[in-house]
């Protein structure tokens, strides 16, 4: 879960969702999105690659079992928690089960 030279880089929100097969569900110029990760990740465990994004991310955790890593620091994803990160941070996720987790992404514009 540590940043590496092999980390993926997502310049746009569309790039992020294209990487999980949802590129056709979001406009290429999208600057704001909300998704329930339970609708995206249905097979577990799901382990994301380490990636860097050029947009803000808010993760609203209501009910799940998982871990998240930001810049190599790993923590459990606790129910009733909110996580935030700025553009440029390295991150990744490991999900063992997701019932309700919302990812809100937005650009600086």
Label the model's feature ranges.
Residues 72-87, 102:
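Short acidic-glycine-tyrosine-enriched beta hairpin
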Residues 63-69, 82-83, 91:
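Short beta-strand segments in beta-sandwich/barrel cores
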Residues 3, 70-71, 93-97:
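Short, conserved acidic/polar surface loops in the N-terminal third of protein domains
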Residues 61-63, 86, 96:
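A short, compositionally biased micro-patch
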Residues 88-109:
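Ligand-binding loop in jelly-roll beta-barrel domains
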Residues 54-55, 78-79, 98:
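Short, well-ordered loop/turn elements at secondary-structure boundaries
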Residues 52, 84, 105:
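Short aromatic/basic micro-patch
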Residues 1-66, 75:
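Generic protein-terminus/edge-of-domain signal
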